[in-house]
Structures are given as structure tokens and as C-alpha cells.
Amino acid sequence: MSEKRVQPLARDAMAYVLAGGRGSRLKELTDRRAKPAVYFGGKARIIDFALSNALNSGIRRIGVATQYKAHSLIRHLQRGWDFFRPERNESFDILPASQRVSETQWYEGTADAVYQNIDIIEPYAPEYMVILAGDHIYKMDYEYMLQQHVDSGADVTIGCLEVPRMEATGFGVMHVNEKDEIIDFIEKPADPPGIPGNEGFALASMGIYVFHTKFLMEAVRRDAADPTSSRDFGKDIIPYIVEHGKAVAHRFADSCVRSDFEHEPYWRDVGTIDAYWQANIDLTDVVPDLDIYDKSWPIWTYAEITPPAKFVHDDEDRRGSAVSSVVSGDCIISGAALNRSLLFTGVRANSYSRLENAVVLPSVKIGRHAQLSNVVIDHGVVIPEGLIVGEDPELDAKRFRRTESGICLITQSMIDKLDL
């Protein structure tokens, strides 16, 4: 990312975050919450990354469309994102599916989530709309994408990530020319088209779109009138524009925010238990690819006032310690040993317990002598004394949600079924 140009484009934009998805591949982690509300990084929620990018980019009008099990997400947004000032032309709207257009319809797709709220969006009169997915982990300055959108005269500008070509089969892929104009949009292709001049890589859609607002409103109205449409940006709106208008690809490397340019641009879809575990554990590295300590690009979130973490006991066989770990406030490590683990707020790890490669969500209690490795422990779980996880794959698979790579998800309902 080059030196930032001072432009007012972000102030004329509205960010619209699509946060209604369930995230079913996260299994029990999303039984009680939408994927954007899942905890990440020790104190934040996944949605905080898209919202923080918008705020740090200078965007001061934000809408968040919610749908699936939205209570915890809405509560988080109300508590952590209520600082916008209408008298300064700022706004923050939470937009649950509420059958505004039809008495029988919820949001039928991503485009429909915009269409059903046209009467809320249009009075703000933003010049540009930045459509964002609320369930990805990355840091990006949207001002650069807005500038490219204006300079290119595009109808839509699509954020794209360069990925090895044969890893792009699970994405929507952009087939572009030498000017990064999109010739074709292919959903999950078996043979992804390469990038001109770099054929070993493909441009995968990040689910980030920039439109002139007037054009977008016309597009979603036209789509709503089409009985054959699935009401989706990736399946309907974008392919229509590629065929009938001008679509341009914006490369994430041109606008990603990173503290060290030796690192590759960081973007993660933490949509599986393995990916979620790995992205959190990566934060325990000496210099992680994702810098959450960058004061120039903070990740804003709701944070309760908590006491600091505490480590107690220093006996030979009972020493409160943590190595290569992230430990949040209000944690008490009472004679327990942590290695390469990430603990959210309010965790209690009792004497003689050991955690290795563990992601522990808030308010978890670890019983004495528990030995846990390669785990994700859900919010509020009480781990019984002496429980061992990570040593017997067959037993772990019977008791918990164990992935093929050996990561175990532990929830309270699973613990309650144990015969200990």
C-alpha cells in the first residue's frame, strides 16, 4: 500500500455490512450466534474487523444487516458501536430482517438485504456504497478501492485476492484483462482462469463491492423484479454487470494494511473449525502476520472494564505460567501451564492443568489436572478435573467435535454428556 492520498471519498460513502450468515461449517460455535458474532483474537468479534476497516478508512455511515440468531450480535453492536454522532452526519444502523417489503419474506439473499432497506439507505444520500461481508478477518483501507472505482469509471469495483490458481476452486473467480477489467465471473470453477502475466495465480472475490449508490439501487430493484433471481450479489448482480456494464477488479495488495511489508497480505475466511483455530493460534507467533497491536489501525470492539490477568503459585509442580500465549484481562492462571494458547477474558485455569495450542473463549473454567491440547473451548464451558483431550484421537472423536486435522471443539453440552 502506497502513501495515502487525501481524498474525501470515504466521507461520501456508506458501508453496508452483510452479517446475517450462520456459518454452518463452524458447527456448534454458531448454534447460539451468527458467524460475525463469533469471538476472535482475545477480545473482539469477527465483525469488528470489517467495521474497524470502515471506521479507520474514514467512513462514517454504516449499516449492518442481520438475520440468523442475531441477539448476541445486536447486543455487541449496541454496546460497542454506539458512538456515532448524527449531528456530524454520522450514522450506525442495525438492520434486522423485518419483512419490510413483504409480510412473508425475510432476507432472501445478499442483494435482497440491500433491497429491503432502500428506504433507510436513500435518505442518507451517500454517493458511494461499500458492500462488505461481516465474517472475514483482514485489515484494509477502503479509500484506495473507492479511488480506483472513481478513476476507472466502473459500475462496480470488486475486491479480489490473489491466490494460487488451483486453490481458487472454492471462490468466485474474476477473469480479467491486462487493465483488471472483469471479462467473466465464474463461481467455484474447476479450472480457474489465471491472471494475465501471472498465470499461476487467480483473482478470487473477497465479497467486497463498491458501487455508485444510484447505480446499486437501480440494480437491486431490477433484480427484485426478476422472478428467476436468487437475490444474491455473487450469483445475480455481479454476473449481470459483467455482461452488461463495466466491472473492475481491485487487488487487495493495493489497499491492505500491514505493519511489515515482508508479510503477505493477510485475509482469512475463518469459516471452519480448523481455520478458526489456526487464525487465533497464529496470533501467538512472535511476529504474527496479522498485527492487532497496530495503533494506527486499531480493531475497535466492545470491551468491558476488567481487572488485569493474574498468574499465581510458583511451586516446582504447580507454577502459573504462559509461554508464546495471549492472555486477556480477568484471567487467573492459578498454578496452570499455558503454551501457544489464546485465552479470552475471564478464564480460570486451575492448578496442575496444562493447555497447549488451545483457543479458550470467555468465562471458561479449567479444572485441576486437566490436560488439553489442540482444542477450541466454547464460551462458559466448565472443564472437569482430570479431563484429557488431545492424546487419544478415537476417544476424542467419540466425546467431542474432532476435525480430520485433530482439532477438538468442546462445548458445555458435550461435557454434560460425559460419564466421568
From Swiss-Prot:
One of its GO terms (molecular function) is glucose-1-phosphate adenylyltransferase activity. Its EC number is 2.7.7.27. PROSITE patterns: ADP_GLC_PYROPHOSPH_1 (PS00808), ADP_GLC_PYROPHOSPH_2 (PS00809), ADP_GLC_PYROPHOSPH_3 (PS00810). One of its GO terms (biological process) is glycogen biosynthetic process. Alpha-D-glucose 1-phosphate binds at Y107, G172, E187, K188, S205. It holds the Pfam family NTP_transferase. Pathway: Glycan biosynthesis; glycogen biosynthesis. Signal peptide: none annotated. HAMAP family: GlgC (MF_00624). Involved in the biosynthesis of ADP-glucose, a building block required for the elongation reactions to produce glycogen. Catalyzes the reaction between ATP and alpha-D-glucose 1-phosphate (G1P) to produce pyrophosphate and ADP-Glc. Belongs to the bacterial/plant glucose-1-phosphate adenylyltransferase family. PANTHER family: GLUCOSE-1-PHOSPHATE ADENYLYLTRANSFERASE, GLUCOSE-1-PHOSPHATE ADENYLYLTRANSFERASE-RELATED. Homotetramer. This is Glucose-1-phosphate adenylyltransferase. It comes from Rhizobium radiobacter (Agrobacterium tumefaciens).
